[in-house]
Amino acid sequence: MLRALARPLERCLGSRASGDGLLWQSELRPHAGGDYSIAVVQANSRLEDQSQVFTSSSATYVGVYDGHGGPEASRFVNRHLFPYMHKFAREHGGLSVDVIKKAFKETEEEFCGMVKRSLPMKPQMATVGSCCLVGAISNDTLYVANLGDSRAVLGSVVSGVDSNKGAVAERLSTDHNVAVEEVRKEVKALNPDDSQIVLYTRGVWRIKGIIQVSRSIGDVYLKKPEYYRDPIFQRHGNPIPLRRPAMTAEPSIIVRKLKPQDLFLIFASDGLWEHLSDETAVEIVLKHPRTGIARRLVRAALEEAAKKREMRYGDIKKIAKGIRRHFHDDISVIVVYLDQNKTSSSNSKLVKQGGITAPPDIYSLHSDEAEQRRLLNVLY
């Protein structure tokens, strides 16, 4: 009886995936151009990944925000970025590259302002940041914007070839990670007089020996040299000597018209891509049913993480959050199907304004319903 009563709520808010108390999913939902599936697995003591999808009859917004140093920055982006995009799109007559850049800039500036105000009480906020991956589909045009190393991958078929025979994986985002030689060169070029700007420590390249990503929301102490001289931050924070910003919040943005051979998009935090290649992820989506496909990708990544430790997936599921971070990162996945025949006005009108925000912490069992209502009121 109780299980039957719970099913409608799970269809609305999403549910824990069977067998893993730290894995949450929403199996399949409609958007104006097809369906989407979302799943999250928690590894950290506090979930640092945040993710969301909002839909209307004319547009679909997708966001994956991979926090570091704590969840504050990713939660902030989760609350503010989409409302800014919607506000500026209305002011400028629709979505555009400039609208997206303006929304990112406003979100960054507002977060930095909050950090400055909270510095006397919470100086550690200056060390919190978040990668930021956004996808937006409007009028058959796709926008992908990102900061950091979350990734968007397109699965498509070659024109005239049966999709059952395979799909091509195309990476749409740029990894802003100093593990990539071109990114290291970019960071060094912006800091030519700092021989310590990129260091190889603990087996990987890091900016100032601390962080791998070169672009983010937040990480104020690596963007604003004045924090090094601030007495409060010197006493209670982690002052890093800087001559100029070591990181930026300038997103990489691509724009493309969707084509009939474009089948689906995969948006995911780097916790997924650490274990699965672009090609493997696309193959999994292509060969399996839609329902629960995001969870299937998460499970595939966890199985790979288990193999690396000579364990089984069942063993990983038993590990508590916090300790589990030693085996894998938080992972967020959103799969968006692109059904060209559903983009007609008659079909898109059937899609209600709405969407879903993943839980701020999987332990809470459900998405933040009040926060979701607040965002919907702002957006619509």
Swiss-Prot record:
Mn(2+) 2 binds at residues 66, 270, 329. It comes from Arabidopsis thaliana (Mouse-ear cress). Keywords: Hydrolase, Magnesium, Manganese, Metal-binding, Protein phosphatase. Residues 35-338 form the PPM-type phosphatase domain. Its EC number is 3.1.3.16. CDD domains: PP2Cc (cd00143). Binds 2 magnesium or manganese ions per subunit. InterPro entries: PP2C, PP2C_BS, PPM-type-like_dom_sf, PPM-type_phosphatase-like_dom. Belongs to the PP2C family. PANTHER family: PROTEIN PHOSPHATASE (PTHR47992). This is Probable protein phosphatase 2C 63. May dephosphorylate and repress plasma membrane H(+)-ATPases (PM H(+)-ATPases, e.g. AHA1 and AHA2), thus influencing negatively plant growth and fitness. Its cofactor is Mg(2+); Mn(2+). Pfam families: PP2C (PF00481). The gene is PP2C63. It is an enzyme of class 3 (hydrolase).
